[in-house]
From Swiss-Prot:
This is Communesin N16 acyltransferase cnsK. The lineage of its organism: Eukaryota, Fungi, Dikarya, Ascomycota, Pezizomycotina. It comes from Penicillium expansum (Blue mold rot fungus). The gene is cnsK. It is an enzyme of class 2 (transferase). Communesin N16 acyltransferase; part of the gene cluster that mediates the biosynthesis of communesins, a prominent class of indole alkaloids with great potential as pharmaceuticals. Communesins are biosynthesized by the coupling of tryptamine and aurantioclavine, two building blocks derived from L-tryptophan. Disruption phenotype: Abolishes the biosynthesis of communesins A and B and leads to the accumulation of communesin I, a non-acylated version of communesins A and B. Pfam families: Transferase (PF02458). Its EC number is 2.3.1.-. One of its GO terms (molecular function) is acyltransferase activity.
Amino acid sequence: MERSLSFEPYLLTPLDHIIKDFYVSSFISFPLHDPTTAVSALKDGVERLTRALPFLSGARVPSSKLPGKRNVMEIHPSPESLEWIPMLQIKHYRDTTLVATCSPGPTGCSDLDDSWCALPIIIPADRPSPVARFRASVFPDGILLCMTLNHAVFDGSGLGTVLKMLATCCCANSAMDHPVSLPTTYAKEASSRQIILESAAPSSGSDSEAYDRIFKSNDIIPGLDKGITSRRFSFPASKIRALKDACNAAKPTDQDPAISRNDVLTALLTICMTRARQTEQTKNLTTQLAVPVNLRRKFHPSLPDSYLGNTIIPLVVDIDPPTVPSSRCGTSPMHAHLNELTNLSLRIRKELKLLDEKDYTGGLVSYLREQSDWGATSMKFTDITVSSLRHLDINGLDFGPEIGRANSFDVQSGMYPGICDIMPTCGRDRVEDINDVPWDVCVTLEDSAWSAFMEDDLVLWALEKI
């Protein structure tokens, strides 16, 4: 199948252009008695998916379709990229096992580095930039499937949709030329891109200043010169629910918007990470938090949840240096920090509510389209970024009788310190209520900050260690 599949090249939207050109890898494990049969089913599944959506086999290349604009990119058929790396790579490992490879280490994270990925995080400029690639690492006891996507083409929701479509294609038992029913098509994707472009509306000067604050990138990835480690935590749902209830009860007025569980967990992680990283030189400095927000339902008409392209923007919040609460005998860490947690959670929620204004997305798209250099306006790197993948519903995904259900899901660890990923829900089959599923989080920090983070009384409380 490594011949080039034809499709009409298409321009990436302004929202795709604000994401830097790097790759995101996700991993799904399948314990198996007969991996050989599963490999054949996986090959067929990838081929069905690529036939249905041939642009997945394409590459991101410069475009000349917008005269007067610089650094505009499009997706184009790319036989050379398929010659370089096929859509599905298969590697066999007979001297180790799936269990050993995927077992969490002392940090709670699997040691899945670039050597297990279909593509590296950054591809050299003289190489093609493929849209998507897959890699199956085959062990005597199962398969580790890696899907690597170009983040300048897909966001987190798009990642989840591609994985679900691959599962559907692996389940299909029809002839290869028989169409598979998928939630999106080339035509539907084109329609969604058109909705984004047609949403553009004039933005005010104050709006432009707000957009400048979000998108004027510093082009410097912070902390790459420092040793970093990623750790995975599982916060009991009861703790996050208690924190949400306490923060909502502590709101200054009844008119304030309701605070969500995602809001309070983001606030908790941000406060504890900021304290852990604090030094004598930084203790009085403001910290910037970015929360990527999905805009699919903010457009008019709204985009389908199955749209694959980027619709995320960073909600940026400036955070004052953390305070040292006055400790009182018998006061839990949650109540000792309640004012700070409530204030930050409420600020996050109020910023999110601003995105509901009807003209927000139109002004945003207009601002991005008006830029003369589409490559110069991208998300800035902030001190802390908290992304949520909890809604993806990937764990337990059924890939058919030969491959089985997804046993575990993981993402490649953060590429720089300050990244937090709230992972998709897992263990839903072990609880009666989705609200009782723990909140799994992967945190990446400088090695020098981990001791303080692990000893923070708020972290210990949230993990039920005190």
